[in-house]
Amino acid sequence: MSNKSYDNNVNINERKTQKKFILTTTEGKPLKFNLKDSNSDIEIESEVSNNDMVDTSQHFHKNNIVMKTTLNDDINHILKKETKIDELSRIDQFKIIEWLYIKLNRSNATDMLLEEVIENLKKPKSEISLNLILRKREKTMSEKLKNLKEKKYSCLEIAKLQFNKVTLDKISLFSKEILDLKINTVDEMKELASFVFVKAITEKAFLDTYTKLIGILKKNFKCAEEKNMGKESTCFFASLLKLMMKKIEENHTFNRDIYIDKENKTEIEIEEEIENAELARKLKRTQAIGAISFCVSLYKNSITGVANIKNTVNFLTKKPSSENIELLCEILRQGGPQLNINHSETVNQILHYIETHNIYGPRMEIIIEQTIEKLKREIKLNNVSTKSSNIFANLFISNTGIAENGKKINEREDIEKYFEEEILPGLGSCYEIADLEDMVDIIVHGFNQFNQSEFVFHYFTYVVTDNKNGTKLIELYSVFLADIISNKDVNIFSIIKRIKNDLNIYYIDYPCSKIKYPEMLCFVKSTGKITNEEFNALKVPDFEIKVKDLVYKWHSTSDERLHAVFNNCDIDRIINAL
């Protein structure tokens, strides 16, 4: 290095080509280092005038050392780091040792590491080598909020929001907004496709809306990565089809019996485990049937051809099972008439298969029978004639029996529609028992409009299967309707007997019916519309266990209906078993 000293007024810009530098004091005198003299820093500092003004954009102080070279910025940056290291080195060594003893496990491997660390800490300060260890830092709340905000306004999240908001009458508007989004990667398109697929197979009421929107996006909805590849097909639509077939070709087991290990478990734990298993099974069934409906909907809206349906039928007919039979029936219910026009051989194949494999008990018999009746009725209404090659052509020939059955089916559908549109929405605004009185006129009107026995049967069916409104309906019957809708033409015992015979079906589709049905019996018995013998005949296994919550509620509120159903011995036994 050069021994030449530089004055404070030297223009650094004039020395850009020079690479030599020296360390000076603020007065421009060369700095002499004396590592043995611990007071050197203090002596240099005493020479500095308090009136000295330093341009911090060009100079940096560390112990009054000033860097004045073309490399001063880099050196000053290093000195800043050195200052931080000096501060770290002042940590109490004894506290570090104590912390290490606590944090490190005392195994053979960690003993060696601990001894080495302690030995280094005991060395003179100048001899310790400082190793910077990087560790994952937990994000602050502001950083987390920032990430959430960035995610919220990403194109992917906006696209999901559009699918959540879309309505059937505004599909063109939402499709334009989605197509204008600039999604970058294929992975984002796959994530969006997965999101849309789950909505399509679980939200049955909006399936047609989603299908029509998908049809618009089918060809042109591409991300930047896809556009660069120059592919004609879209990752979004291809992913939807792949997810659909994957769901259809699963090993479906949603109709199988559930086995619960009762060992070392309380009754409450067993009931909870059964309830969770039933909910999981119901979700699997909903998704499987939803995938079939989605496949048929794509065909009905001319978005895909019949190939996917044929592949589905071929797969489901390979291995007989009650689940596969139910899914085949779903194909006919959703798209039978449309398929019968140009692909009657596919309808013929499904009908032949479900007829020859109708061996899975009364539940599947009912499903198959209702499917065929619905198919006949829709084909007749649409004036579609079946080809002579269809071996089930005789199913679609009109006769008086079919007309009579069709009338009954239409009446059942009208009653269900009346409940869905007139009764159930009104129950949503009833929060107290007194509020239920407002619904009496609506229910009596329906009772007088339709077949009375059939109407009461549907009423009690909703009590058993509707988890949200079932309790309100039976309270309404018990308090206001029991005397109004009961007459010689309505046999309450026979109606509830019909429901009891279908409980195996309800247990699968509506797990809440396991509790709702026994509780309904208690409410009906409290009105005196069934005798003790009829009440006992309508009971199910573990009846008292299933009504214990209702008994406790009535007992704690001194409800008079409790003693109309049970005697004192029964009440004490049920209460003490809680």
From Swiss-Prot:
InterPro entries documented for this protein: ARM-type_fold, MIF4G-like_typ-3
Residues annotated as domain MIF4G: 156-378
Location(s) in or outside the cell: Cytoplasm
One GO term (biological process): regulation of translation
Molecular function terms, GO-annotated: RNA binding; translation initiation factor activity
Any coiled-coil regions, as ranges: none
GO cellular component: cytoplasm
SUPFAM superfamilies in the cross-refs: ARM repeat
Main localization, broad class: cytoplasm
Pfam families for this protein: MIF4G
The keyword Transmembrane belongs to this UniProt entry's keyword annotation: no
Disulfide bonding pattern of the chain: none
Signal sequence extent: none
Family listed: Belongs to the eukaryotic initiation factor 4G family.
Subunit structure: Component of the eIF4F complex, which composition varies with external and internal environmental conditions.
Protein name: Probable eukaryotic translation initiation factor 4 gamma homolog
Organism, scientific name: Enterocytozoon bieneusi (strain H348)
Gene: EIF4G
